[in-house]
Amino acid sequence: MGQKINPIGFRLGINRTWDSRWFADNAEYGQLLHEDLKIRAYLMEELKSAGIAKVVIERPHKKCRVTIHSARPGLIIGKKGADIEKLRKKLSEMTNSETHLNIVEVRKPEVDATLVAQSIAQQLERRVAFRRAMKRAVQSAMRLGAEGIKITCAGRLGGAEIARTEWYREGRVPLHTLRADIDYGTAEAETAFGICGVKVWIFKGEILEHDPMASERRATESDNQGGSGRERRRENA
């Protein structure tokens, strides 16, 4: 079962927590869920060049707090914070409530599964050979501390007449082990021959304590140790 299920959903409540963190009664739940989906779709499309790894949405009393984890936060913030203010106003209109916007820098994009998948998809769109793109991503992830990585590419690879799936793995990726800290990300490459799908699994080690926030806390600590200078974070109210 661990081979087929989404590794993040499989570990929710064990060593992963939800990206939408709020509570609502039955009357409001559907509306807020659709709001979250619209916010994420808008941000992923609008900030495509900023390398969005994750969007966390929290809803304290009659407010909305959106935290964007990005590999290139400067593109979101803009000159003197002009772009982030426009973005905050747009999100306030979408949620119809006061919205706070936080930007958190991802210091090691090479070991973030979503960013790795996006990078490979962009290379496929630029007609880079899929094997070269996969191998380069694997080498970068292992060099920066990943204990294992697996990448699959599916579609008309290299312009082939028949679609197929190719995969590459290095190190351990124990999908059945619930205490394993496994990051998972997907992306689509819109090539001249059709859409190619990219999936990435990255094994970052084992988390022995039973704590839903453990994976997120561990990633933050790793970023702070690996990066130079202070953590780059911008809050806009």
From Swiss-Prot:
Belongs to the universal ribosomal protein uS3 family. PANTHER family: 30S/40S RIBOSOMAL PROTEIN S3, SMALL RIBOSOMAL SUBUNIT PROTEIN US3C. GO terms for cellular component: cytosolic small ribosomal subunit. Residues 213-237 are annotated as: Disordered. This is Small ribosomal subunit protein uS3. The gene is rpsC. GO terms for molecular function: mRNA binding; rRNA binding; structural constituent of ribosome. One of its GO terms (biological process) is translation. It comes from Rhizobium meliloti (strain 1021) (Ensifer meliloti). It comes from the Bacteria. Keywords: Ribonucleoprotein, Ribosomal protein, RNA-binding, rRNA-binding.
